[in-house]
Amino acid sequence: MSKQLYTLEFPVRCSPSILYEFLSTPAGLGEWFADKVDERDNIFYFGWNGSFEKAEVVENEQDKFIRFRWLTAPKEEYFEFRIDKSEITNQTILIIKDFAEKKDIKDQSMLWDYQVKDLFHRLGN
């Protein structure tokens, strides 16, 4: 069964440049996304409980977005952090795109909610 793309949006109170650092650097991602994060030659090594997963940076634009692809995933699947601004409130919005089996989207969304709460705590939100 193929996975489906789903999108989550979170309003955040910080500048896009600060948020981008937390989404695109080993030091920033290590604060909230994984226990340990290293990067070599555009490959990120994410560690949880002693095991590591590798993801390549597929595409990125400074202060706008970064897209990763797990090396074990099909080429068309990715996860992405995008930074946008609300036209009405001018508030920064974090948009997360990811793939999951249809039956797992709710659980995966809850996991992202938990991780983003940790990110917001680190950002002082």
Model-identified regions with their sequence ranges:
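Hydrophobic ligand-binding cavity/cleft-lining segments
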Residues: 1-37
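Short, charged low-complexity linear motifs
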Residues: 5-6, 17-18, 91-100, 124
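Compositionally biased, intrinsically disordered low-complexity regions enriched in proline and serine
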Residues: 7, 21, 79-80, 115
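Hydrophobic pocket/interface hotspot
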Residues: 19-20, 29, 57, 68, ...
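Short, intrinsically disordered, mixed-charge
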Residues: 21-31, 63, 114-121, 125
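Hydrophobic-ligand binding "helix-grip"
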Residues: 35-39, 44-102
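A conserved amphipathic terminal alpha-helix motif
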Residues: 97-125
